Amino acid sequence: MAVKFIDGSSKLFIVREYATMRDGQTLVKISDREGKCIWVSADCLEVLEG
């Protein structure tokens, strides 16, 4: 699944995995084209078609 940040950035990321925390927040592990991965809050991402 492809996603991008909701701040208007055009850079695309691929979702690798996700986790729901005890407080209900969802974290998503995303990677860029170089394969670098980071965990971010799902609230700051927009899902793209695909």
Predicted segments, located by residue:
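Basic/aromatic-rich interaction segments and small domains that mediate binding to polyanionic partners
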Residues: 2-44
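Short hydrophobic/aromatic patches at helix-to-coil boundaries
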Residues: 46-50
